[in-house]
A protein has these predicted regions:
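Surface-exposed, active-site-proximal loop segments in enzymatic domains
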Residues: 48-50, 85-94
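Well-ordered, non-membrane alpha-helical segments in soluble/globular domains
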Residues: 16-22, 52-64, 97-108, 136-140
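Conserved phosphate-donor/acceptor-positioning beta-strand/loop module used by diverse small-molecule
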Residues: 36-39, 57-89
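Conserved substrate/cofactor phosphate-moiety recognition/catalytic segment
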Residues: 1-33, 45-46
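Oxyanion-hole/transition-state-stabilizing segment in secreted/luminal serine hydrolases
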Residues: 40-51
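NTP-dependent small-molecule kinase module
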Residues: 92-148
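Generic beta-sheet signal
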Residues: 30-36, 74, 122
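A short acidic, often aromatic-flanked loop/helix-cap motif at beta-alpha or helix-coil junctions
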Residues: 8-17, 82-84, 128-134
Length: 148
């Protein structure tokens, strides 16, 4: 079974709220399955709060929560802590290295909040074959439900 799937990378931190809103609305209303690498509402709720001390979406909670409700599956990529902090040559946004523990804690807290709201959550560790199977099964189940 094949699906029309598009991959959307984060538009980044330096765009306006209106542009973030348009990016999410446009990509959430497509007929295809859209996979986001960092969804702006989540990215801002965590990185904005930890790195800049402010979530730029705070005043738009209802509207952006409505966008979150259109997401079928949230995949939190969570390898072990030692792999996360093995930066190698990867560039990081300002403040990430100094605040890595707070970022991990906030992403984890948000994953639990979304799960408590009944959202489909998969914590994916790319080093674990079990985690890969769980993610593939979760995606397959959601796609199967949408086809029925």
């Amino acid at each position: 079974m094949y699906y029309d799937i598009e991959y959307q990378h984060s538009p980044g931190k330096d765009i306006t709220l209106d542009d973030m809103h348009d990016f999410m609305r446009f990509n959430l209303t497509k007929e295809c399955v859209t996979v986001f690498d960092r969804f702006p509402v989540i990215e801002e709720r965590v990185c904005g709060k930890v790195l800049r001390g402010k979530d730029r979406f705070e005043g738009y909670v209802g509207e952006f929560d409505a966008m979150l409700s259109k997401v079928d599956l949230f995949i939190f990529c969570m390898p072990n802590i030692f792999d996360i902090v093995d930066w190698g040559d990867r560039e990081q946004m300002d403040g990430v290295k100094d605040n890595v523990v707070d970022l991990i804690n906030e992403y984890t807290k948000l994953a639990f909040e979304l799960k408590a709201q009944g959202k489909n959550i998969v914590c994916y560790n790319y080093e674990s074959s079990i985690s890969k199977r769980e993610m593939i099964n979760a995606i397959s189940n959601i796609l199967k439900e949408e086809k029925e």
